[in-house]
Amino acid sequence: MAKVINNRNRKPRKKVCILSAKGIEHVDYKDVELLQRFINNNNKIASRRVTGASARMQRRIANAIKRARFVGLLPYVKE
């Protein structure tokens, strides 16, 4: 009989933050390409579990996205 691997006890691999891997400390609200990586299909800000960002970086990302939306660089809702 084949051995069944139990995935319930397996610890999920920790995601690596894209910004920390590239050495980016400051998230600029004008960098729309970078900010779009942290937005899902419905233009909502993706959670830390999805992005793998630290708490500090997630706050910086969220503030930059909100600023970009206010200025008009990113849409609030999906068209």
UniProtKB/Swiss-Prot annotation:
Which keywords fit this entry according to its UniProt record? Ribonucleoprotein, Ribosomal protein, RNA-binding, rRNA-binding
Q: InterPro entries, from UniProt? A: Ribosomal_bS18, Ribosomal_bS18_sf
Q: Does the keyword Metal-binding apply?
A: no
A Gene Ontology BP annotation from the UniProt entry: translation
Gene Ontology molecular function: small ribosomal subunit rRNA binding; structural constituent of ribosome
What's any one GO cellular component for it?
cytosolic small ribosomal subunit
State the family it belongs to: Belongs to the bacterial ribosomal protein bS18 family.
What is this protein for, i.e. what is its function?
Binds as a heterodimer with protein bS6 to the central domain of the 16S rRNA, where it helps stabilize the platform of the 30S subunit.
> What is the protein's given name?
Small ribosomal subunit protein bS18
